Amino acid sequence: SLLWVLDQTKTAMGARLMRQWLLSPLKSEDKINARLNGVEELYNASVLRVGLQETLGEVKDVGRLAGKISYGNATPKDLEALKKSLEMLPSLRFRLSGFASPILTGLLSSLPNVDDLASLLSSAIAENAPALVKDGGYIREGYDAELDELRGMREHAASLLKDMETREKDRTD
């Protein structure tokens, strides 16, 4: 298919955008030329293009992840994937800043500032989060003191009960 021939995208988001572009082609000559200028710059600036492709290769499907989060269906792995993708934004901004065509600089200016969210996820989500919420352990140790205390109680429940039993025996003897 034409999509198969043209699709050199590195992300699921890019593949969806390419498909949309093919299904709804531009009609304005100015917009077509602007897009072609962007493609030409990407083609000619191979070092910048390869760097951009490497960075984009690290970005997960943020649109899908956002949908899962908004519907309450996100897993700890999804949150970890979002965290890693948001952590790539500074690199993506840097890579895009090397381009001059308006369509590419427009992408740069359209990137949202989500540094606070990235920071929150980095401090809250544990590395190598489990696949399911029910497995627990996806909140980073040290993020919440009360949670850490509860984890400690769970991990040391047997010794806590034994100590309590000993104290009660001593008290009642």
What annotation goes with each model-predicted range?
Residues 1-173:
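Alpha-helical bundle segments enriched in helix-capping/polar residues
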